[in-house]
């Protein structure tokens, strides 16, 4: 069911806000080391300012402690709190009867060159001031202390920047004021742990039509994992495919023990030139605990510190995924990983995502942009950071993982070149997608 608020900003600008479920069917079962799903229920936000419609989406995987913290009901709870904040702020504004309005929604980003134009006073331009107003209500929402607020803020912020970009006829990466990198970044397609090898091969066939950069999900079963990698390679060779594998990312989804990591190291090191990274081999609990009174196991932590060096010595890089939510997590991760996978739902959106990327680079960590299982709306938003600030590209394949019938948007913010590299579409405004007719 759609929930909605309508109001008049400064008695001049019509604004409509709404939230609804965005149900997605997957092309193949999407399996990781901790879950298998065939459908997803994401949240879709729409913010309409006069005749300009901005859209935002947050991907909502099955909940997992310390990592995936929100479901649709949580997003709806947050949305209701946000519109309550808007209602209260509106009443204050009416009492004060101030004509001008200004709020710097980007003041937490220390480098002032980012979002430079959107920080300014709008001098009576109410159609832009309303976005500043909605950002202020978002930043002051009483639910921001809740762990599920990050995914909620991500979707709302996305819709705000989509609408603002459409109004200014600019794509988001130009709003951010980041140039498109001269070196194009790779697009990875995820081959998940489907229930059967036939489904894994079907996924391989589908993904390899788009890119030679493949992300393969594995669990703690080393023999099975290496069989999957071997089978994927043979599949492309035996099909006489014109596509060769450029790079493979191995994603353990926090499922390995130190012993398993060392067994995989033996098997993966001979193909180190092919492996771009190993994602999240260690448990999330290596650096975090569900119970705040519980202490970190220092011996366990030190073992993973050693494994980082062992992998490095064999030419393999370890990246964090589940363990990195916001920039606050970065300092502790430096000892464990060579890089981090940044996802907008976990950071809280593009603004904190940008801050997290910048801090990661300051700490000497490599960067990668990931996405949840989501439509092209969501992954296109992430592409605006990937195009310039990701060292290793990313797995922006969410739009390919879902079937066409449940995809509400078209015309991605980026195009895939024949070699699997991403090129931004500079003529697509806002996030860069359009609603299907």
From Swiss-Prot:
Mn(2+) binds at residues 251, 279, 321. It is an enzyme of class 5 (isomerase). The active site is at residues 217, 395. One of its GO terms (molecular function) is metal ion binding. Gene3D superfamilies: Enolase-like C-terminal domain, Enolase-like, N-terminal domain. Transmembrane segments: none annotated. The keyword Disulfide bond does not apply. It comes from the Eukaryota. Its EC number is 5.-.-.-. GO terms for biological process: peptide metabolic process. Disulfide bonds: none annotated. Keywords: Isomerase, Manganese, Metal-binding. Belongs to the mandelate racemase/muconate lactonizing enzyme family. This is Enolase superfamily member DDB_G0284701. The lineage of its organism: Eukaryota, Amoebozoa, Evosea, Eumycetozoa, Dictyostelia.
